[in-house]
Amino acid sequence: MTKEQAPRASGEKEEGCPPEYIVFDEERGEYICTLTGEVVEETVIDTGPEWRAYTPEERTRRSRVGSPLTHTLPDYGILTTISGYRDANGRKLEARLRIEASRLRRLQAKLRATTSIEKNIEQAAREITRLVEALNLPRGIIDTAMMIYRQAAEKGLVRGRSLESMAAAAVYAACRIRGIPRSIDDIAEVVKGGRKEVARCYRLIVRELKLRMPIVDPVRYVSRIVSALRLSPAVERRAAEILVQARKMGLTAGKDPAGLAAAAIYIAALELGERRTQKEIAAAAGVTEVTVRNRYKELVQKLNIPLPAQ
């Protein structure tokens, strides 16, 4: 291992390791940055079950320490929560004890988030969960988005800014990191702040947290847009061919992948006689008509695509 490749010692911890480079080493119980070799977090308890389980009862009995750690809670979910309905043996509580347990649960919720940052993170967790469910995204996006939001909160980036917009920006960043094909317009549709504010917060997060965003292949957007427009598999295949050709010629770098996918679908639909308007395609892709029109002109000209008379 060369000097440049050697992992940093734990005492030389570098702040702000990009989330997409953080992996969990199950054997050592550590979160490690694959970019620098830095141990981001150590002595993490392995929270999964020890053996295979085939029934809910077996899973409960064989799990060592309960639920896994989560970024959606200020305390990472380490603390237990008072049950409001059953005792330690699983028996239902009588009415008087249920009322008392409910009061204790409310008190515990207040005590759990003690600082303003923790309270903000708790509110953000609810908003991020709402966004992920509204957009029908994989549940894993919640943890990635919360990791990003938590870093932003700890750096003071959320102060004075809309919690909704910052949460939406974190969700968009998480989608980019995990390769989920969603445009910023898709996400802005389910928040009050609007696209411009979400985009501003996203740029702030990427810049200040020094996130390295992977380039999203526009081909990944094609299937979802084609399905929304009820176009044929032939259109999907042809649009993908156009995008592969565009990538080889260097036409996709720095362009919105959703806009490129929309333009390629528009061209493919024209070629195969399954016409859709630019307005329809833009709406399905979550981009503007202007974006579709500009990318369409560019692809047709640079790739020398002959089109039937419109």
Curated annotation (Swiss-Prot):
SMART domains: CYCLIN. GO terms for molecular function: DNA-binding transcription factor activity; TBP-class protein binding. Keywords: Repeat, Transcription, Transcription regulation. NCBIfam families: PRK00423.1 (NF001658). Pfam families: TFIIB, Zn_Ribbon_TF. One of its GO terms (cellular component) is transcription preinitiation complex. GO terms for biological process: transcription preinitiation complex assembly. Stabilizes TBP binding to an archaeal box-A promoter. Also responsible for recruiting RNA polymerase II to the pre-initiation complex (DNA-TBP-TFIIB). Coiled coil: none annotated. Belongs to the TFIIB family. This is Transcription initiation factor IIB. The keyword Transcription applies. Sequence repeats lie at residues 126-209, 220-301. InterPro entries: Cyclin-like_dom (IPR013763), Cyclin-like_sf (IPR036915), TFIIB (IPR000812), TFIIB_arc (IPR023484), TFIIB_CS (IPR023486), TFIIB_cyclin (IPR013150), Znf_TFIIB (IPR013137). It comes from Pyrodictium occultum.
